[in-house]
Regions:
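Active-site recognition of the HExxH zinc-binding catalytic motif
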Residues: 71-84
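Charge-rich, solvent-exposed alpha-helical interaction surfaces
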Residues: 11-14, 18, 76, 116, ...
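Long, well-structured alpha-helical subdomains associated
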Residues: 65-68, 99-102, 114-144
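Post-HEXXH active-site segment of zinc metalloproteases
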Residues: 67, 83-115
Length: 144
């Protein structure tokens, strides 16, 4: 992972610093996806909160374009903040585990990630279109 953009470097340092304070490790994989579920499901990023026995982690696949994985980092960082702040949508998803609760959480998370991208001047290209496509694909995958 070679990051040259100063805003991207600063954001990565911010995420690393804040996650460390919350017992969350920041991990980067070199592939286009990472293993993100016990059944070896794959994704571009994943957040797991810490528990009483183990540190949590944010894992990001960096094998694609940096504009894409920086967007994923903003998304997973947002999940970490939701967990830490006991955000109602995070708690609802944790409690209910339903597809609709997950979709509502992801919709909010993408909006927040796009705000972070803009606030920190991250070089993420057309992040709004990427977010819209992700949410459209997720919505289309919901059980009718």
């Amino acid at each position: 992972m070679n990051v040259r953009n100063k805003n991207a470097k600063a954001f990565i340092c911010k995420v690393d610093r804040e996650s460390s304070r919350l017992s969350v490790n920041l991990l980067f994989g070199s592939g286009k996806t990472i293993i993100s579920t016990p059944d070896r499901g794959r994704s571009e990023g994943h957040f797991v909160p810490p528990d009483e026995d183990d540190a949590g982690y944010i894992a990001i696949a960096t094998g694609g374009k940096s504009e894409q994985w920086l967007h994923t980092l903003a998304h997973e960082y947002t999940h970490m903040l939701q967990w830490f702040r006991d955000h109602p949508l995070w708690l609802e998803w944790q409690e209910k585990g339903t597809e609709i609760a997950y979709y509502k959480l992801e919709e909010y998370t993408e909006r927040q990630a796009c705000r972070l991208i803009e606030k920190h001047g991250l070089p993420c290209g057309d992040h709004m279109s990427r977010a819209d496509k992700y949410l459209r694909d997720l919505r289309n995958s919901l059980t009718p």
